[in-house]
Amino acid sequence: MIEIIFLDVDGCLTDCKIIYNANGEELNFFDVKDGYAIESWLKLGKKVAIITGRKSAIVERRAEDLKINHVYQGVGDKFAVASEILKFEGLSFKNAAAIGDDYNDYKILDAVAWSFKPKDAIKELDVKTKLKHKGGNGAVREMIELIIKSENLYDEWSKRWL
């Protein structure tokens, strides 16, 4: 069973675009449907970890909103961080899924039981499942739904919405 999902931010939770306002503040767009899926996943007692190569106050804010307690930014070696999280949670890569979109996600995607990439990820990433949705446009929701359905938890999970 998948107990934890590892999420990349740029290109997975967002569409990989960064916008700066007139004050130089960074802005990103997050898909609300991804957020609902994450919240419902957490209500099942599952875990979520954000591991991203960049640092952004916006990511911290989004993680707070969704009550994600594992948030690691400015990470060079995502595999090493994922290993530490799994150790802390008493889990292994056999209990993990991950979504990534670029070369810096390769090692973690190769290690997990179920790997995903958004429709617009680089083609060189070899994953178990290529999603139909683009990053920042429902890819994380699609990933969670596929996991939930494969583990026969969809009815319980979907009740979290009502």
Q: Which residues does each PLM region occupy?
A:
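Alpha-helical substrate-recognition element adjacent to the catalytic core
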Residues: 1-77, 160
